[in-house]
Curated annotation (Swiss-Prot):
Mg(2+) binds at residues 74, 76, 78. This is Phosphoribosyl-AMP cyclohydrolase. One of its GO terms (biological process) is L-histidine biosynthetic process. Belongs to the PRA-CH family. The lineage of its organism: Bacteria, Pseudomonadati, Thermodesulfobacteriota, Desulfuromonadia, Geobacterales. Its cofactor is Mg(2+); Zn(2+).
Length: 125
């Protein structure tokens, strides 16, 4: 039986979140054993925030949740790919569909931002 290697990166593994239909990479976040288990049990994506030092469910504030369709691991068992149905217009906290909207072009990083919601309205604190 395969056991995921959470020790290699100090208890965390990268989680690549991908649209289950298009294959588009929506985001990359980190999981520990607890958040992976929560994800598998609830069918919603859960992560560990390194900056806020807390657990969080994708969409808990914005409503843009992710419904898990498939979970895969790589040959080293130290990374997961989670294929999801994105509920709501955007996976990124900036309001963009994907967190990967900055592209290397002609020797510089160019932002191709197309926010689908205003993060200042959604994440009022």
């Amino acid at each position: 039986m395969i056991k995921l290697d959470f020790e290699k990166m100090g208890g965390l593994i990268p989680a690549v979140i991908q649209d289950h239909e298009s294959g588009e990479v929506l985001m990359v976040a980190f999981m520990d054993e607890k958040t992976l288990n929560l994800t598998l049990e609830t069918g919603k994506t859960w992560f560990f925030s390194r900056t806020r030092n807390k657990y969080w469910m994708k969409g808990e504030e914005s409503g843009n949740t992710q419904e898990v369709k498939e979970v895969l691991t790589d040959c080293d068992a130290d990374t997961v790919v989670i294929k999801v149905k994105q509920n709501g217009p955007a996976a990124c906290h900036t309001g963009n569909r994907s967190c990967f909207y900055v592209k290397w072009e002609n020797g510089e990083w160019v932002e191709h931002s197309n926010p689908l919601f205003d993060p200042n309205e959604v994440y009022k604190k």
